[in-house]
Design a protein with these regions (language model features):
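Detector for the c-type heme attachment site
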Residues: 66-72, 111-112, 125, 145-146, ...
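Interaction-mediating elements
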Residues: 50, 60, 112, 118, ...
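Gly/Gly-Pro-rich "capping" loops immediately C-terminal to redox-active cysteine motifs
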Residues: 70-103, 120-133, 159-172, 214-249, ...
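The canonical Cys-X-X-Cys-His
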Residues: 53, 60-69, 140, 200, ...
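C-terminal capping alpha-helices of c-type cytochrome domains
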Residues: 23, 102-115, 128-152, 246-257, ...
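N-terminal type II signal-anchor transmembrane helix
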Residues: 1-35
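Electrostatic cytochrome c docking/interface patches
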Residues: 33-59, 173-205
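Extended surface/linker regions that mediate inter-domain or inter-protein docking
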Residues: 9, 13-23, 132-197, 287
Length: 299
């Protein structure tokens, strides 16, 4: 009996040590500060800027997909023991962060995916938003500041045991875009808003097209998505090369492919892309037509 008790004691001790090690190292991974360099642009407060900010939050950058139509936040993923990901309440209401965050805090979160204290934010598409020009990011921040306060207290983002093991292994690095960015890179000025390839590329970047469909737009598995999630489609000429401009408009506004089948609205936010202007939709179409053909998933 004494021998059995000793063995059990050793086993319990090893398990406790292992769990403690996983917790310590995963916490370090979650909270390791990231340095960045960015000049804060002026924040416009006029009605034109607020309208642009609202448009960006919906039709282009789609902030409302995660933070909710009222920007009051919501649980995005609830999959314990893997983890729970929560998009915070961005307003100044009870449970919101709007009242305690500076304009610089919002800028750092949007363009760099970095939160208070330098910690990397979870599932923040900063590699796309990094491209956002000063006027656009300023307008977006101004709009976020202007929305009515929402009283909504939410649980914190949390990783369970399985998630923490994967954090230590580095398997979840794709969920933290701030870790995979050059935060000192020089940002080119955005092109003028026009039906041009350059403006289409800009919109595809800040709109997250390249975030889901990949840098080359050839599609594939979605970053941070569960293994059983449907892959993003190939948007290169290899995938939609036969689509006309009218086909492209119909897909983004009605959620219907040229063959009449429906796009999956749970993955393709047609309710938001339909709010893009004709100019914006045409510019993106023009850009998509110029990318090199690529086999599916070859980014």
């Amino acid at each position: 009996m004494q021998t059995l008790a000793k063995v059990l004691g050793v086993v319990v001790g090893v398990v406790v040590l292992l769990l403690s090690t996983i917790f310590v190292f995963s916490t370090q991974t979650l909270n390791k500060p990231i340095a960045y360099a960015d000049a804060s642009p002026p924040i416009p407060r006029d009605s034109t800027a607020l309208a642009r900010g609202r448009h960006l939050s919906r039709a282009i950058s789609k902030c409302v997909e995660c933070h909710g139509n009222d920007l009051g936040g919501q649980v995005v993923i609830d999959a314990m023991p893997m983890g729970r990901v929560v998009a915070p309440n961005l307003t100044s209401g009870r449970g919101g962060i709007g009242g305690s965050r500076s304009d610089d805090d919002f800028l750092r979160a949007i363009r760099h995916g970095i939160g208070v204290g330098g910690r990397p934010l979870v599932l923040m598409p900063a590699r796309n938003y990094w491209h956002m020009g000063d006027l656009d990011v300023g307008s977006l921040i101004a709009y976020i500041r202007s929305v009515p306060a929402v009283d909504r207290e939410l649980p914190a983002t949390k990783f369970g045991l399985v998630g923490r093991v994967l954090l230590v292994k580095g398997d979840l690095n794709g969920m933290f875009e701030a870790k995979n960015m050059d935060h000192t890179a020089k940002r080119p000025p955005p092109p003028a808003a026009d039906t041009t390839v350059a403006y289409g590329r800009y919109l595809a970047e800040i709109g997250g097209c390249t975030g889901c469909h990949g840098p080359s737009l050839s599609g594939g598995s979605l970053p941070g998505a569960p293994p059983d999630a449907k892959p993003a489609s190939n948007l290169t000429p290899e995938g939609i090369g036969t689509w006309t401009e009218a086909d492209f408009f119909r897909a983004l506004r009605e959620g219907v492919r040229p063959n009449g089948t429906a796009l999956d609205s749970t993955q393709m936010p047609v309710r938001l892309t339909r709010e893009m202007t004709d100019l914006e939709t045409k510019a993106i179409y023009m850009y998509v037509r110029t990318v090199p053909p690529k086999p599916f998933g070859t980014n």
